[in-house]
From Swiss-Prot:
Interacts with host SKP1. Interacts (via LXCXE domain) with host retinoblastoma-related protein 2 (RBR2). Interacts (via LXCXE domain) with human RB1. Interacts (via LXCXE domain) with retinoblastoma-related proteins (RBR). A motif (LXCXE motif, interaction with host RBR) lies at residues 111-115. InterPro entries: Clink (IPR045832). This is Cell cycle link protein. The gene is DNA-C. The keyword Ion transport does not apply.
Length: 161
C-alpha cells in the first residue's frame, strides 16, 4: 500500500489500474447476479418467481448492453437437457405473460434459438451431449458475433466471453 501511495507510481498508471479493477469487478458482479436469476428460473413450483427471474435477467442484460454500447447474447451451453427446456420454456412463458398484460414486444424481448431440442431422443443418446441454444439477444434483431458480448450459461457457471 505504501508503494501505491508513493509518488513512484504515476497517477495515470494508478488510474488505469483502478479502471481495470472496476471493470473486472462489474463483470464479476454481473455474472453473480445472472447466476441468481438462473437459480430462480430453474426452481420448479414457483411460476411467479421464475417469471420475475426471467424479467429481472432481461432487464439486467439490457442495462449491461446499454452500458457496453453493444449487443449482448445469452447462450445456454449445458449437458442437462431439462435445464435447457426450463430456461427456454420460461422465456416463452414470459412472452405469453406480457401478451396477457397487453404489453408490446420490443426487440429487447425477442427470443433466438439456434437449434430445436427433440424430445424423442433417449437418455443413452444424451450421454456427453452438450446442448447449445441462444436464448435471448438484448438490443438488436441482427448482430455480429464478433461485435457482441456473449453471456454463457454452462452447467456450473455463468461467464462472459
Amino acid at each position: 500500500m505504501e508503494f501505491w501511495e508513493s509518488s513512484a507510481m504515476p497517477d495515470d498508471v494508478k488510474r488505469e489500474i483502478k479502471e481495470i479493477y472496476w471493470e473486472d469487478r462489474k463483470k464479476l458482479l454481473f455474472c453473480q447476479k445472472l447466476k441468481s436469476y438462473v437459480r430462480r428460473i430453474l426452481v420448479y413450483g414457483d411460476q411467479e418467481d421464475a417469471l420475475a427471474g426471467v424479467k429481472d435477467m432481461k432487464t439486467s442484460i439490457i442495462r449491461y448492453s446499454e452500458y457496453l454500447k453493444k449487443p449482448c447474447v445469452v447462450i445456454c451451453c449445458v449437458s442437462n437437457k431439462s435445464i435447457v427446456y426450463r430456461l427456454n420454456s420460461m422465456v416463452f412463458f414470459y412472452h405469453e405473460y406480457l401478451e396477457e398484460l397487453g404489453g408490446d414486444y420490443s426487440v429487447y424481448q425477442d427470443l433466438y434459438c439456434d437449434e430445436v431440442l427433440s424430445s424423442s431422443s433417449t437418455e443413452e443418446e444424451d450421454v456427453g451431449v452438450i446442448y447449445r441454444n441462444v436464448i435471448m439477444a438484448s438490443t438488436q434483431e441482427k448482430f455480429s458475433w464478433s461485435d457482441c458480448q456473449q453471456i454463457v450459461i454452462s452447467d456450473y457457471d455463468v461467464t462472459l466471453l
